[in-house]
């Protein structure tokens, strides 16, 4: 990309240069034309002007003999010239100067350049060439002969050719010729590309000019003079700045570079020496706190480093941040990154530093000495130089607590883990031992401490190497005098560390070196902060032996080493070896045998047992290894212990047996093994649950089957609710655990026994309810359990304390599937009654379980006709309860719809339906064939019964179905009589409008329905009366009953004012007497108020009464006693009783007419008593 950009820029510059040349040509032509125009300003024809003709003549004289008075030698040629032309161009060729001259010698100049100048002199034409040398020569020649215009044009031509590489040369030329335009242009390019200029670009400049240029272009001329390697310019600077020395020598430029450092980095010894001689500070530091010596070493500069050391630079100066001395920087050079020559130079620098008094024990910001760094960088040359230094302290530790030896022993590592291999390059693989030339061996030979315990943790180098998994280093240390029983902060020995990290070879070596295998840790090891490679539950345990460690961290090869060591130690003559003790326990009371089991090292566990480890040791909580294996759900370990004769009868502190634990933790193989070894399978737990129940309650049928197979009792009587005795089957059913119940049934448990009272009679209702498991299952709706019980011979007809069979219970709890299962049983007896006398069918009807009832009828067809203690069959009860579903069901199963209740009433279902007021049942009974005219014991039809109640719809239904509406009961009443008697207006309307019932019929008391109305009328009597007149306008209202009472008289005697008024409005006779001579006028009442109001409301003259006696005084009419009528009330009166006369305006009787005394009072006083 960078090259493409450069190419584009060069192309762009080329275009700009071409464009610039074009513009110059155009400018020259324009200037020429401008001159011509000015010369002939006032002439119309420019071609004929003197000036133009003169210029044309001069141009034509170029290289012509005509008028020539001068020769010019150009190279080997002599060119004809003209003095006046030359004099016109330059003062140096004035006529006075050329008066005696015959020839001008220009042979010293470039002929081509000279000819170009002469052509321009005559023709004012100049052809530019992109040749900077040619233009420069032409410009010098023009300057020589004071051809100012030509020089300016050459300047402009040269400016188009100026670039970064030649700008210095053109600048020098411009200064020589005093070409200010070109010089300024070059100065601008130099200023913009100052930092891009190379020392070669300044080589041709004189010291004075270069110094002048540098001063004008940069703030730091000394630094620039050194960069261009011009000692003469440096000298000029020192002379000029003598009064400000040495301060000026120690200034840093914009890049932070010191003048001395620039000189040294360029190996300018003469300049560097000059600077130092003028008091330049050799220990000056840059902005980063690095001295010149640091920087020289950093860039691998032997010349600069040795120069500074010789000139007294501080050899122990440390950098500002990392606190690294020059010796540190030298030590950091690695042969993996640098060539042998560079490494050799570094060794020379190190030697020079040490000879100059460098301190080899100084530590950087990380606490590392040059020795540390030389080991990390594997800088053998510097390492050797440091070892030869007598002041070297081998035991200094860095901030990580590492000595030089610790870093050296990691040289052999093959791990790629950065915590193990801190070196940046690939680890070196050179076997498993350190030769005598290794850093580590040389350090130990020099006297380095092989233990060097860490201050914080107390880990010695051997433990650190083992902890890092560097077994080769650890073996090297172990065989080089490291202490085998050193204990760190937590009481851990190197043997512990080796076992924890699985270093079998190191373990064997340490045991050979006398390491004690019975030492126990004092504290739990801390959990590593970083993501640990090795994590175990053992991280929080202490009091561990090395063997605990090996087992806990699952290193069987290490365990084998220790076991072999024990076997060998028993026969060894080496007193250094100590025999391991397998009975030691860690902080969790775990022996090595227990840990071997939990880590799955059963082969090792067997070897431990063979070596005398106890299999039945109990922990502080009373648990054996068998208990713990079961609780861990470690079947393999549990079986291992059982195979090696672990005690199965030992209980935990909570009283749990191994069998109970195995069931609780769902270990079928362990349960089988324990049962095989004769465990007691009837021992209950602390809650009284036997092992079989524990298994079934957890849905562990495989374990339960194992227990049963080994002879476990499936019935198992035990304590139940309220202290009664129950079997496991009772309990399973009571808890709705069908899978458990079915398992117990299939396992041969007792399926028929009910719960029993406790040994001392304990137990409440449950102990005496007599319910078998089948009763309980039917009650809870456990279909699978019921089916299983029936399959395995449960008594389907067993009765509980209430006499109920299972089918009774199933029906009462509405469990349809169970009902079908029970009814389908071949041995079912459906005639069994409970204490309430209910058969299963009766129970089904009681609970409206039609499906059950239908199923029972299929088995026993006569079940529906059974009657209760009141003589009612199921249809009767259903009708009385208005249970339409049951009625429809019974109708559907062909129940007798005309059967009568077996009691004194002898009512049919239709009678009961009417009494219940259920229209839909009435309709369905009629549809099913109920006889509509069946009579009760009082000879009443269903219509009679409906008429007495407010059941107009049922009346209509009965009428539609052909009921005998004329039928009368034992009192001679038809349905209309009874409807009127009970004031059933709607029923009366139905009877009067929907049939032709005789509304004038008399009952045995000689009363028609209207007489009944007058005698029994209620609040709606007037409405009933109006209905009669509406339906029968010609009804004989004055017709008396058997005792001579009219409707009005009966109503008046009953005080039914509304009915009386309705009757009076209909125009009846008012004064009719009954057989006892009583009428409304003489009937004894508390007040005549009603009578007066009835008379007052007469709007027309009523019909006259007839008779043989006066209605008022009862005098018999004869010849002397004539008949008269009261013209107001129509009564038959004698003369004495009708003496008063008065006009009756409301009857349109304007003349006085006869009225009775009562009517006179009414007419005069109004309807007021």
From Swiss-Prot:
ANK repeat residue intervals: 217-247, 255-284, 288-317, 322-362, 366-396, 490-519, 542-572, 588-617, 621-650, 654-683, 687-716, 724-753, 769-798, 802-832, 836-865, 870-899, 905-934, 938-967, 971-1001, 1005-1037, 1043-1072
Write down the membrane topology.
Answer: Peripheral membrane protein
Q: Which SUPFAM superfamilies does UniProt cross-reference here?
A: Ankyrin repeat, FYVE/PHD zinc finger, POZ domain
Q: Name one GO biological process term.
A: endosomal vesicle fusion
Q: What Pfam families does the record tag this protein with?
A: Ank, Ank_2, BTB, FYVE
Q: Which UniProt keywords are present, listed alphabetically? A: Acetylation, ANK repeat, Cytoplasm, Cytoplasmic vesicle, Endocytosis, Endosome, Membrane, Metal-binding, Phosphoprotein, Repeat, Zinc, Zinc-finger
GO molecular function terms here?
phosphatidylinositol phosphate binding; small GTPase binding; zinc ion binding
Q: Where is the BTB domain?
A: 68-130
Q: In which residues is Zn(2+) 1 bound?
A: 1110, 1113, 1134, 1137
- Where can this protein be found? Cytoplasm; Endosome membrane; Cytoplasmic vesicle
* Residue ranges the record marks as coiled coil: none
Q: Where is this region: Interaction with RHOD and RAB5A?
A: 650-759
InterPro entries named in the record: ANFY1_BTB_POZ, ANFY1_FYVE, ANKFY1_BACK, Ankyrin_rpt, Ankyrin_rpt-contain_sf, BTB/POZ_dom, SKP1/BTB/POZ_sf, Znf_FYVE
Domain of life of the organism encoding this protein:
Eukaryota
Give residues where N-acetylalanine occurs. 2
Positions annotated as zinc finger (FYVE-type): 1104-1164
- The UniProt entry annotates the motif NPF at 421-423
Residues modified to Phosphoserine = 270
- Annotated binding of Zn(2+) 2, by residue: 1126, 1129, 1156, 1159
Expression tissues: Expressed in kidney proximal tubule epithelial cells; at protein level.
- Xref: CDD domains: BACK_ANKFY1_Rank5, BTB_POZ_Rank-5, FYVE_ANFY1
Where's it mainly located? Answer: cytoplasm
Q: Record's GO cellular component, any one?
A: endosome membrane
How this chain assembles, per its entry, is:
Interacts with RAB5A (in GTP-bound form). Interacts with RHOD (independent of GTP-loaded status). Interacts with EHD1. Interacts with VPS26A; the interaction is independent of EHD1 and is indicative for an association with the cargo recognition subcomplex of the retromer complex.
State its role.
Answer: Proposed effector of Rab5. Binds to phosphatidylinositol 3-phosphate (PI(3)P). Involved in homotypic early endosome fusion and to a lesser extent in heterotypic fusion of chlathrin-coated vesicles with early endosomes. Required for correct endosomal localization. Involved in the internalization and trafficking of activated tyrosine kinase receptors such as PDGFRB. Regulates the subcellular localization of the retromer complex in a EHD1-dependent manner.
Protein name listed in UniProt: Rabankyrin-5
Per the UniProt record, the source organism is Mus musculus
């Amino acid at each position: 990309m960078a090259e493409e950009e450069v190419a584009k820029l060069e192309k762009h510059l080329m275009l700009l240069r071409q464009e610039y040349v074009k513009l110059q040509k155009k400018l020259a032509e324009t200037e020429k034309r401008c001159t011509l125009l000015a010369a002939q300003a006032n002439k119309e024809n420019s071609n004929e002007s003197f000036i133009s003709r003169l210029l044309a003549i001069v141009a034509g004289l170029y290289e012509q003999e005509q008028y020539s008075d001068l020769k010019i030698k150009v190279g080997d040629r002599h060119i004809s010239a003209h003095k006046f032309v030359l004099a016109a161009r330059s003062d140096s060729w004035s006529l006075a100067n050329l008066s005696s001259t015959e020839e001008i010698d220009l042979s010293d100049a470039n002929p081509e350049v000279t000819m170009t100048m002469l052509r321009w002199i005559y023709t004012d034409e100049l052809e530019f060439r992109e040749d900077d040398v040619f233009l420069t020569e032409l410009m010098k020649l023009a300057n020589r002969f004071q051809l100012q215009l030509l020089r300016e044009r050459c300047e402009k031509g040269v400016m188009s050719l100026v670039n970064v590489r030649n700008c210095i040369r053109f600048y020098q030329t411009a200064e020589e010729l005093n070409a200010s335009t070109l010089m300024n242009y070059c100065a601008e390019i130099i200023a913009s590309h100052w930092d891009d200029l190379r020392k070669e670009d300044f080589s041709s400049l004189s010291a004075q000019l270069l110094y002048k240029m540098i001063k004008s272009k940069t703030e730091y001329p000394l630094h620039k003079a050194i960069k261009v390697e011009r000692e003469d310019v440096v000298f000029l600077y020192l002379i000029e700045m003598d009064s400000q020395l040495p301060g000026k020598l120690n200034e840093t430029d914009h890049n932070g570079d010191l003048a001395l450092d620039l000189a040294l980095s360029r190996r300018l010894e003469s300049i560097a020496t000059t600077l130092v001689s003028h008091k330049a500070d050799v220990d000056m530091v840059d902005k980063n706190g690095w001295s010149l010596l640091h920087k020289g070493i950093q860039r691998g500069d032997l010349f600069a480093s040795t120069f500074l050391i010789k000139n007294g630079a501080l050899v122990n100066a440390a950098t500002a941040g990392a606190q690294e001395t020059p010796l540190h920087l030298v030590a950091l050079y690695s042969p993996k990154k640098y060539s042998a020559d560079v490494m050799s130079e570094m060794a020379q620098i190190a030697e020079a530093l040490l000879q100059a008094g460098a301190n080899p024990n100084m530590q950087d910001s990380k606490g590392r000495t040059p020795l540390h760094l030389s080991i990390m960088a594997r800088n053998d040359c510097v390492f050797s130089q440091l070892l030869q230094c007598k002041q070297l302290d081998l035991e200094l530790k860095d901030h990580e607590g590492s000595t030089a030896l610790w870093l050296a022993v990691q040289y052999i590592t093959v791990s790629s883990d950065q915590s193990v291999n801190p070196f940046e390059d690939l680890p070196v693989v050179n076997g498993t031992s350190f030769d005598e030339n290794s850093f580590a061996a040389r350090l130990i030979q020099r006297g380095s401490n092989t233990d060097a315990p860490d201050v914080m943790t107390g880990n010695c180098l051997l433990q650190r190497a083992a902890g890092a998994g560097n077994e080769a280093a650890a073996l090297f240390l172990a065989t080089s005098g490291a202490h085998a029983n050193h204990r760190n902060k937590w009481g851990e020995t190197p043997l512990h560390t080796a076992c924890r990290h699985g270093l079998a070879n190191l373990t064997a070596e340490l045991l050979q070196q006398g390491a004690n295998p019975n030492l126990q840790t004092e504290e739990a090891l801390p959990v590593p902060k970083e993501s640990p490679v090795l994590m175990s539950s053992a991280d929080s345990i202490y009091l561990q032996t090395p063997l605990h460690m090996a087992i806990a961290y699952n290193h069987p090869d290490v365990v084998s080493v220790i076991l072999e060591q024990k076997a060998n130690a028993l026969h060894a003559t080496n007193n250094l070896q100590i025999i391991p003790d397998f009975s030691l326990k860690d902080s969790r009371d775990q022996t090595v045998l227990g840990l071997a089991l939990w880590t799955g090292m059963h082969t090792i566990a067997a070897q431990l047992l063979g070596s005398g480890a106890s299999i039945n040791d109990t922990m502080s909580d009373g648990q054996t290894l068998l208990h713990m294996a079961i609780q861990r759900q470690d079947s393999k370990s549990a079986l291992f212990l059982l195979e090696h004769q672990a005690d199965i009868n030992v209980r935990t502190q909570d009283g749990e047996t191994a069998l109970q634990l195995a069931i609780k933790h769902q270990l079928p193989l362990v349960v089988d093994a324990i049962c095989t070894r004769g465990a007691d399978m009837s021992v209950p737990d602390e809650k009284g649950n036997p092992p079989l129940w524990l298994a079934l309650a957890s849905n562990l049928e495989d374990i339960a089957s194992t227990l049963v197979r080994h002879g476990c009792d499936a019935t198992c009587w035990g304590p139940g609710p309220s202290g009664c005795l129950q079997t496991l089957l009772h309990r399973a059913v009571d808890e709705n655990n069908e899978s458990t119940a079915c398992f117990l049934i299939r396992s041969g448990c007792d399926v028929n026994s009910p719960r029993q009272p406790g040994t001392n009679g304990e137990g409440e209702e449950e102990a005496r309810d007599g319910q078998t498991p089948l009763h309980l299952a039917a009650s809870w709706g456990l279909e699978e359990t019921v089916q299983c019980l029936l399959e395995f011979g449960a008594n389907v007809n067993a009765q509980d304390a209430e006499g109920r069979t299972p089918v009774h219970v199933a029906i009462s709890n509405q469990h349809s599937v169970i009902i079908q299962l029970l009814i389908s049983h071949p041995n079912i007896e459906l005639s069994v009654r409970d204490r309430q006398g209910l058969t299963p069918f009766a129970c089904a009807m009681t609970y409206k379980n039609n499906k059950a009832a239908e199923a029972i009828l299929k088995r026993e067809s006569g079940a529906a006709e059974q009657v209760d203690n009141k003589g009612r069959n199921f249809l009767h009860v259903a009708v009385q309860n208005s249970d339409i579903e049951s009625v429809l069901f019974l109708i559907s199963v062909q129940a007798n719809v005309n059967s009568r209740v077996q009691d004194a009433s002898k009512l049919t279902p239709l009678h009961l339906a009417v009494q219940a007021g259920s229209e839909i049942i009435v309709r369905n009974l009629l549809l099913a064939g109920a006889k509509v005219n069946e009579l009760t014991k009082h000879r009443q039809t269903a219509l009679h019964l409906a008429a007495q109640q407010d059941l107009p719809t049922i009346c209509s239904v009965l009428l539609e179905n052909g009921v005998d509406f004329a039928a009368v009961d034992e009192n001679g009443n038809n349905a209309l009589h009874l409807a009127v008697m009970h004031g059933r207006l709607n029923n009366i309307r139905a009877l009067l409008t929907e049939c032709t019932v005789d509304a004038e019929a008399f009952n045995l008391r000689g009363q028609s329905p209207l007489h009944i109305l007058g005698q029994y009328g209620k609040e709606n009597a007037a409405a009933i009366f109006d209905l009669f007149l509406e339906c029968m306008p010609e009804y004989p209202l004055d017709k008396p009953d058997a005792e001579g009472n009219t409707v009005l008289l009966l109503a008046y005697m009953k005080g039914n004012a509304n009915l009386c008024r309705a009757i009076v409005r209909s125009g009846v006779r008012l004064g009719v007497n009954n057989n006892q001579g009583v009428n409304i006028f003489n009937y004894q009442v508390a007040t005549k108020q009603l009578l007066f109001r009835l008379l007052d409301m007469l709007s027309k003259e009523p019909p006259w009464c007839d008779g043989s006696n006066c209605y008022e005084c009862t005098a018999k009419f004869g010849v002397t006693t004539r008949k008269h009528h009261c013209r107001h009330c129509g009564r038959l009166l004698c003369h004495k009783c009708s003496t008063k006369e008065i006009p009756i305006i409301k009857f349109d009787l304007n003349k006085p007419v006869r009225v009775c005394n009562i009517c006179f009072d009414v007419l005069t006083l109004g309807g007021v008593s």
